[in-house]
Amino acid sequence: LANDADCFVLSEATDGAGAGANSVFGVILGTGVGGGLFLNGHLLQGPNGIAGEWGHNPLPWRRAEDGAVQRCYCGLDDCIETFISGPGWSQRSNLGLAAGQIAQAARQSEPAAKDALERYCDQLARALASVINLIDPQVIVLGGGLSNIPELYPQVSNSLLQYVFSDQLNTRLLPARHGDSSGVRGAAWLGAGLLLNH
């Protein structure tokens, strides 16, 4: 069986935003944070079935402005999910707004919301840089509700280079081509028995 992030990356790597790339990391940013990995034409699941699940690693390069240590539902402290999921961002922003409302307020030049969006983009860049430093994917595809915030793409892309262990960054950060349909599409690809590699 595959989870939603695995199905998402399978769809986007097969004929979506990551089509034609040898390595695609798919990210779902929503109520939770999920990741899936597609390498050399195959969905990578690993012996534990958790390949790509980087949301329960600690946020890299922690800073004072990231706020107090927070316990994740998994029992660990400061998991990436507690920062960059919708509920995590909302709670840590201390604005009393849902994630989409924070983005909207930032677009309207509300200072605290602009700061919260900038901090979120930096945290997402740090989280993705850790993936780039480990697997160096050609493409990272973002899906889930928060992936619809257009400001993420230029801001995160601009922040990535300061955390990636390289003088250049060729990894492309892209929105999902198939949007909310990617998970269902990936499940269909999986159900057809295509491309799965245990």
Language model regions located:
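ATP-dependent carbohydrate kinase catalytic cores
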Residues: 1-13, 17-19, 25-27
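Short, glycine/serine-rich, charged loops/turns that create anion-binding
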Residues: 6, 42, 146-147
